[in-house]
A protein has these predicted regions:
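Active-site beta->alpha loop and helix N-cap motifs at the rims of alpha/beta catalytic domains
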Residues: 1-23, 41
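Catalytic cores of alpha/beta
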Residues: 1-3, 47-61, 103-106, 110-127
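Conserved beta-strand positions in the central sheet of alpha/beta enzyme cores
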Residues: 11-13, 43, 64, 128
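Short secondary-structure boundary segments
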Residues: 15, 46, 67-68, 108-109, ...
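Active-site-adjacent beta->alpha loops and helix N-cap segments on the catalytic face
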Residues: 15-36, 49-54, 71-96, 113-114, ...
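Short beta-strand/loop segments at the ligand-binding rim of alpha/beta enzyme cores
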Residues: 34-44, 96-107
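Non-cysteine beta-strand/loop elements that form the S-adenosyl-L-methionine
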Residues: 61-69
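Long hydrophobic alpha-helical segments typical of transmembrane helices together
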Residues: 109-152
Length: 152
């Protein structure tokens, strides 16, 4: 409630199959906020398409695979360097929330304008461009890795 009273119009919450300190699943936070502040927009950070479906059913206005790879359910091989979003997960999330009113925000590995447009074509309502802007050394490493592959 303090976040809302401070002026936030959108409240981001973890919406995964993890238990909070009070023993409830993280998804429950969405329902609790909507019950107390119905006009609040909820941005659900999810890990899987199932998380997205549950979050949307609980009342999330936006879902994003922000936590993909960071939870047990959405884990991927940390040794593998991924230079592109998980398009299969994006498609699955778009399908999972279809008809619920929740909008999909693609977040993670949106490193080029072409990737951003591809995500929109696949059903994302919007994209978040993070590291490509805020950490240019990571963008430079991606280019170097791709160009080095050409010479291999």
């Amino acid at each position: 409630k303090a976040v809302w009273e401070a002026g936030a119009e959108i409240i981001a919450v973890q919406a995964t199959h993890h238990y909070r300190d009070d023993g409830k699943l993280a998804y429950e936070t969405i329902r609790e906020i909507k019950e107390n502040i119905p006009e609040a927009l909820i941005f659900a950070d999810v890990s899987t398409a199932e998380d997205a479906r549950i979050a949307a059913e609980m009342g999330a206005d936006f879902v994003a695979p922000t936590l993909a790879g960071y939870t047990k359910a959405g884990a991927f091989d940390k040794l593998e360097i991924k230079d592109a979003p998980d398009y299969i997960l994006l498609r699955d999330i778009v399908d999972a929330v279809k008809g619920t009113g929740a909008r999909v925000i693609m977040e993670g590995k949106v490193a080029t304008p072409e990737i951003a447009v591809q995500c929109l074509y696949m059903g994302a309502y919007a994209v978040v461009v993070g590291n490509a802007i805020t950490r240019p050394h990571i963008t430079a490493k991606r280019f170097a890795r791709a160009l080095n592959r050409f010479h291999d």
